[in-house]
A protein has these predicted regions:
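N-terminal Rossmann-like dinucleotide/flavin-binding domain of flavoprotein oxidoreductases
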Residues: 1-65, 145-162
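Short hydrophobic core segments
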Residues: 61-71, 111, 187-195, 259
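Glycine-rich dinucleotide-binding loop and its adjacent helix/turn
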Residues: 68-127, 162, 218
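Helix N-cap at the beta1-alpha1 junction of Rossmann-like dinucleotide-binding domains, i.e.
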Residues: 74, 138-140, 198
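FAD-site-proximal beta/loop scaffold in flavoenzymes
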Residues: 83-104, 176-178, 183-265
Length: 271
């Protein structure tokens, strides 16, 4: 829902937060520790080392089963001028973009035509900002069949979005974006949405198997290569049910279901 806060469809920032530490404790009796980081995992002793950044203290927690849900970070390519581009991953990110949008930029360029790129373009146009989407692939929304993606592209064009497909970005300057094709696009606002990179630092330290796509490989029960460590969310690779190939699907819907599956398995329920 983050892009829709930028467009004003979601009016209140609080509506972006489905839960808070207080609400999770009240509803589920969960002990949620914010400003707290797990810095290492000892899979043999079944312990994690925890750093409390507010108190400056470090301590250990033991576990029977461990669930990793470290998420992912935006991919930022080494393009000259890339520091001008804003990414969209957190509430803090969306605040920055909303502030820039409220300053009424005359033009915007969105780098990336995936789900986030298409949604942010939709909302920029909704705010009356002429918007261009640049996508290296020959279509937007790569997971879709070309026939379906072409319908999305047609609708985007009808709504005023300019598309540059099968093209990339070579440089970003103070007011323009130059493409590999040589085209120069006016860009008061630049948003980068070309995907995410799984966060697997702890997993690697714990000796968990990492797949070719960079995620933690899990089975149908969300178990990693260590039977006592589960993983869910944007940092996992799963077997595609249709193709049988490993897939990385950093979307909220699958992450939600994965969390429920892992919880059911650990609780002894038939998931």
């Amino acid at each position: 829902g983050l892009p829709y806060f930028v467009g004003g469809v979601i009016e209140e920032e609080d509506a972006l937060l489905l839960q808070t530490p207080a609400s999770l404790h009240a509803r589920f009796k969960l002990d949620v520790r914010i400003a707290t980081e797990v810095t290492s995992i000892d899979p043999t002793a079944k312990k994690v080392t925890v750093k409390d950044w507010q108190k400056g203290e470090e301590y250990e927690l033991s576990y029977d089963k461990l669930i990793l849900s470290p998420g992912a970070s935006p991919v930022v390519p080494p393009i000259p001028g890339i520091e001008r581009a804003l990414t969209l991953r957190t509430v803090e990110d969306v605040e920055k973009i909303a502030n820039r949008v409220n300053a009424k930029p005359k033009t915007a360029v969105v780098i990336g035509g995936g789900f986030i790129g298409v949604e942010i373009a939709e909302n920029l146009v909704h705010k009356g900002i002429p918007t261009t989407v640049v996508e290296a692939a020959p279509q937007v929304l790569a997971p879709l069949d070309p026939e379906m993606a072409s319908l999305v592209a047609k609708e985007m064009a009808l709504q005023g979005v300019e598309l540059h497909l099968a093209d990339g970005v070579s440089t970003i300057d103070s007011t323009t974006v130059t493409l590999t094709s040589g085209a120069v696009l006016p860009a008061d606002l630049v948003i980068l949405a070309i995907g995410v990179r799984p966060e697997t630092t702890l997993a690697k330290m714990a000796g968990i198997e990492i797949g070719e796509r960079g995620g933690m490989r899990v089975d149908e029960n969300m178990r990693t290569s260590n039977p006592d460590i589960f993983a869910v969310g944007d940092a996992v690779e799963i077997k595609d049910f249709i193709t049988g190939e490993w897939a990385l699907i950093p979307l909220a819907g699958p992450a939600n279901r994965q969390g429920r599956i892992a919880a059911d398995v650990i609780a002894g329920r038939d998931s």
